[in-house]
Design a protein with these regions (language model features):
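Hydrophobic helical membrane-anchoring modules
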Residues: 186-206
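Conserved anion/nucleotide-ligand pocket segment
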Residues: 178-180
Length: 206
């Protein structure tokens, strides 16, 4: 299965920096996601307005097919660029996704499934999900109609929901869908990493 990171462009809240380049712990969010995807994805694509930033990383970069269409436009680009029946889609601001959880999503995809989408206690998580590439024409029509909210059309699809209880089995701390949208979020993410690193050190040195 191919995977696509939706990197978008620069974020004004971070002084014009690409959110995927922000450091959480000792690695950028992009590098953390790349580590989770390697060994899982056949190809790793990055949908971005700045392909030059990802040179030398071993990923393929793709510009938005429909600029200005937000996350749905990024999803459409991923669907049209993927060479597999399904594509794993990941927003660039999720520093705590794990290979185990992404692999679980990929394993649930099949010929009778249009989408595999987590639904946490905070609601649908459509940008950490798997979609059938055959959905591309439907997504294109939604973009052309101006209906850009991804969650609006999930009920019309053959969607395999990954519910909160199922998520909690692999994510007891509730961090999988923590997204970095502000400087406060970035600070909290780094504090969480420091705390987790300290806990791991304590376990090694009782």
């Amino acid at each position: 299965m191919d995977a696509a990171i939706l990197a978008g462009g620069r974020a004004r809240r971070f002084g014009g920096r690409d959110k995927s380049a922000l450091d959480v712990g000792r690695a950028s969010i992009f590098d953390r996601q790349l580590a989770a995807l390697r060994g899982l994805a056949d190809r790793i694509l990055v949908v971005t307005a700045e392909p030059g930033r990802f040179e030398g990383t071993g990923v393929e970069t793709i510009a938005d097919v429909v600029p200005g269409a937000g996350a749905l436009g990024g999803l459409y680009t991923a669907l049209t660029a993927a060479r597999t029946d399904h594509v794993l889609v990941l927003a660039c601001d999720l520093p705590f996704v794990t290979a185990a959880f992404l692999g679980r999503l990929a394993a649930l995809a099949g010929p009778d499934v249009d989408a595999v989408v987590p639904r946490s206690r905070d609601g649908w998580q459509p940008l950490c999900a798997v979609y059938a590439t055959s959905l591309a024409p439907i997504v294109r029509r939604r973009i052309e109609s101006g209906d850009l909210k991804i969650t609006d059309w999930l009920p019309t699809l053959r969607t395999r929901k990954v519910g909160a209880e199922e998520i909690a089995l692999v994510d007891p701390d509730g961090l999988l869908f923590f997204n970095v949208n502000s400087l406060a979020d970035l600070d909290r993410a780094n504090r969480l990493v420091a705390r987790m690193s300290g806990t791991a050190a304590d376990r090694r040195n009782p």
